[in-house]
């Protein structure tokens, strides 16, 4: 017997292949069906609590809570915010296709646009707001070692989160500056966080 496990970063999003184009152009029905199975698989493999970033997580959370389906306890963000040509943007596809169907990324640029996007996301009743402060290394201009969201953009999202009291989760891969900006403006969770300096740790 062992206690239930916690996974603080996953995506219920389909992804039957490792091709980021397939992730986007697969049908909505496939995304949803795979997401339901992925949620159930988490529970049967010992994960009793998960933090989910994706298009279907909020709906699955609600269905689990209502007893309609079985799954773990889910803390869901809905789609996370990245910059255009960032980690949540499949660059081989037309931008509108990515905006309409990306499984976990919403492409938003600029502080005021991000403020509005946070307010729109709040209408979906998420448990947290997710940003990609860095890339993830999927393609040439998606470096996980560079801060891809500006200081002003990170602060704008953090300020909006503080207004309502919703937690901010920040994807910060291998960038000291992205981690520092995220934490100093109020991010409660750093996702990955492989590169941290002393001043960030002190915060």
What are these regions (language model features)?
Residues 2-66, 84-90, 152, 177, ...:
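Metal-associated gating/positioning segment near the N- to mid-region
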Residues 20-33, 92-117, 167-172:
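Active-site mouth loops of central-metabolism enzymes
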Residues 54-56, 105-119, 188-198:
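Active-site glycine- and acidic-residue-rich loops that bind
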Residues 32-60, 71-80, 126-139, 166-167, ...:
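Divalent metal-dependent hydrolysis catalytic cores, especially in the metallo-beta-lactamase
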Residues 53-98, 104-108:
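Mid-domain alpha/beta scaffold segments of enzyme catalytic cores
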């Amino acid at each position: 017997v062992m206690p239930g496990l916690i996974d603080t970063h996953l995506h219920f999003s389909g992804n039957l292949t490792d091709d980021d184009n397939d992730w986007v152009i697969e049908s909505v029905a496939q995304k949803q069906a795979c997401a339901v199975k992925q949620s159930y698989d988490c529970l049967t493999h010992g994960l009793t609590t998960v933090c989910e970033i994706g298009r279907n997580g909020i709906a699955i959370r609600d269905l689990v809570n209502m007893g309609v389906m079985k799954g773990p306890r889910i803390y869901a963000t809905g789609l996370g915010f990245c910059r255009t040509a960032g980690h949540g943007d499949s660059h081989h596809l037309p931008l509108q296709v990515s905006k309409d169907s990306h499984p976990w990324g919403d492409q938003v640029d600029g502080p005021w646009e991000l403020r509005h996007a946070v307010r729109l996301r709040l209408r979906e009743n998420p448990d947290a707001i997710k940003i990609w402060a860095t890339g993830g290394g999927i393609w040439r201009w998606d470096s996980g070692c560079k801060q891809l969201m500006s200081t002003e953009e990170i602060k704008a999202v953090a300020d909006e989160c503080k207004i309502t009291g919703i937690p901010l989760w920040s994807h910060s891969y291998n960038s000291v500056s992205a981690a520092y900006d995220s934490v100093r403006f109020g991010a409660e969770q750093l996702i990955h966080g492989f590169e941290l300096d002393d001043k960030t740790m002190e915060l």
